[in-house]
């Protein structure tokens, strides 16, 4: 399940650097999208790539793409339902 991130909620862009996006919502919450790419520990040719979602400085969820040699291997989503509830409240 992919949680839709509606950027219309963003009131202003606070910071944009590299692939990290940080913005403030209409009600003053800070949302951060942080890109990551790391080698997978158990297989040298695998990389874990994706975005981490932070709300008000707390890690809430991440979307992962498992890649090898630049090709998509499989994808998964790890989240907790608080993220859905808090974004709806924004």
Regions found by a protein language model. Give the residues of each.
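Mixed-charge, Lys/Arg-rich low-complexity intrinsically disordered regions
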Residues: 1-19
């Amino acid at each position: 399940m992919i949680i839709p991130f509606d950027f219309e909620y963003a009131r202003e862009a606070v910071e944009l650097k590299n692939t990290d996006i940080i913005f403030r919502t209409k009600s003053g919450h800070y949302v951060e999208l942080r890109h990551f790419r790391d080698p997978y520990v158990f297989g040298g040719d695998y990389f874990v790539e994706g975005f981490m979602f932070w709300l008000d400085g707390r890690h809430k969820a991440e979307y992962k793409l498992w890649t090898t040699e630049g090709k998509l291997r499989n994808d998964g989503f790890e989240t907790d339902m608080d993220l859905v509830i808090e974004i709806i409240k924004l």
